[in-house]
Amino acid sequence: MALAEPSRLTKPLPGGREGATVVLHPMLCAYMYSPPEFMAMTGGRLKVVRQVLFARKQQIKIPIVAFLVEHPVVGPMIIDTGFHPSVATDPKQNLGRLYAALYNIEMQPDQAISAQLRERKGIEPSDVRVAIMTHLHMDHASAISEFTSATYVLGAGEWRAFHGARPKLNGYVRHHVEHAVEYKEVPYDSPVIDSYSTFGRAYDLFGDGSVRLVATPGHTHGHQSVILRLKDREALVTGDAIYFTRTLDDERRGWAMADEHKWHRSIGEIRLYRRENPDALIIPGHDPEAWATLLPKYE
């Protein structure tokens, strides 16, 4: 299926309201078992391969997550999609044989974000009009087909990386994005981009300061993180810019890495943000310890 290139954002999306704050709902979509070296390398790539092939009992259980964000005018939006509901019963149908064989996934059908939105909030997938994608790896983009009314907002370079050579070896599954949805790209190299806090490249998505997208490339070429304005503080959803909170201190990179130099720069910006905003809620991509401390709702 041939898809049109994403259009570049040149102005904020409609719905902004001066002084608006948002409500954040973290949502656990599944657990996936991963070799420790895949998430935080202490040796070379050969050590990772050995753990994948021969040390499955040593694997760690990591959360697969997505987020509901409620804006007073825009309404419900999501950050990432988590796994498609079918992954709960037949992973290879959505993820393909390679990833279904590589990863042991624990998921119930009612953990899919579409099911959780209905159960927890009475929100139908068609009510979600904006979906912010930190990146398009399979554990973040598997359920794009569930939210076909949404405009999907990608970081600059992610679409090109997704459609590059050997997508599956780089964490992408082509059919995850092959749906008749609108894709838009944040042009982090254009004059509409500003800086914000400790981040050199930021985009005010609705023009009201409630949702800011910040470029955090490295894990993927087009990776972005999300800063949300709550009533009394900010929340930073890092995506996979950092897998664990401790990554900010030990700087142990994961296996999946598009540009290590840019990754170090990105985590440097996040580390400085943490120091300058000690009250901010910082949510890493796959940290079981951090996830265990999260509340169901942040206002």
Residue ranges and their predicted role:
Residues M1-D127, G155-A215, R233-G239, E276, ...:
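Metallo-beta-lactamase
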Residues V23-P26, P36-A40, Q59, V65-H71, ...:
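Core dinuclear metal-dependent hydrolase active-site scaffold
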Residues C29-A30, T81-H84, L136, G157-E158, ...:
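Active-site metal-binding loops of divalent metal-dependent hydrolases
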Residues I64, K92-L154:
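Active-site metal-binding motif and surrounding structural segment of the metallo-beta-lactamase
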Residues P85, D90-L95, A100-A115, H221-E299:
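Cap/insert and terminal regions of metallo-dependent hydrolase folds
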Residues T151-A156, V237-G239:
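Short hydrophobic/aromatic-enriched beta-strand-loop microsegments
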